[in-house]
Amino acid sequence: MLHVVPLEWTVEEVVPYLERLAVWLRASVLVAFQLTATVALSVLSWWLMPPPVAELCERGRDDDPPPLSHLSLVVPVGCLFLLLRGPSIDRCPRKLPLLLAYCLPHALAFLTLLMCQPSPQAFVGAALLALAVDLSCLGASLLGCDPGASLRRLWLPSVLSLLCATALGLWLLRAAAPFFLGLHATTLLTVTLMLIHDLSLITCQSSFPESFQPSLRLYVENVALFIGMYHLLRLWLWSP
């Protein structure tokens, strides 16, 4: 089979591969930035939390979530409104504020879970919050059309991905520690690679897939990434 392999490459043949590599590198930077910013905001908020608030969280971990945790809904709802009414990412010349707006609600959701040591009800609420932000940021900016129509068209994939993420999270909460950690490492690696692939389509300005299965997979990846990052962050903060 070696005779079919080209031994000499022209510039025209190499350029498409270099462009593809550049797209993957750019997508990798975006993924790394979002992961780093989300975890950094969560950890910074946890360390800067006033002692009275920390004591309140300590008392509320074994019970229902403290009332303070519900304040984290304010900023994500505000970001959701701004992203629905504001410019999409591909039309905005300054993308850094929008990327930070994408990370901040996730960081607040992580912080809420860290504060509450969540009951199943709190976990469902946080998963729904992260999913709503993903829908607003990814759906509205990638589809490049009316955000309201985009969200209405994707309501079924979003509901199914929420159910899948909730079931996965509740199962992982009861998993054994060694299996738990190895599963999360594998999950994070797989999901990150899939997100890089999706972001490569985004950076190439390709059309968002209109079929049901790719859109469902995209949102399942995002919510699964949320779950995996939360558990890894919780293990790191409470490690002996």
Swiss-Prot record:
Disulphides: none
Name the keywords, alphabetized. Answer: Late protein, Membrane, Transmembrane, Transmembrane helix
Q: Which GO terms describe its cellular component?
A: membrane
What transmembrane ranges does the database entry give? Answer: 29-49, 64-84, 96-116, 123-143, 154-174, 176-196, 218-238
Report how it sits in the membrane.
Multi-pass membrane protein
- Indicate where this protein resides in the cell: Membrane
Q: Which family does it belong to?
A: Belongs to the cytomegalovirus US12 family.
* Protein's recorded name: Transmembrane protein HWLF4
Gene responsible for this protein? US19
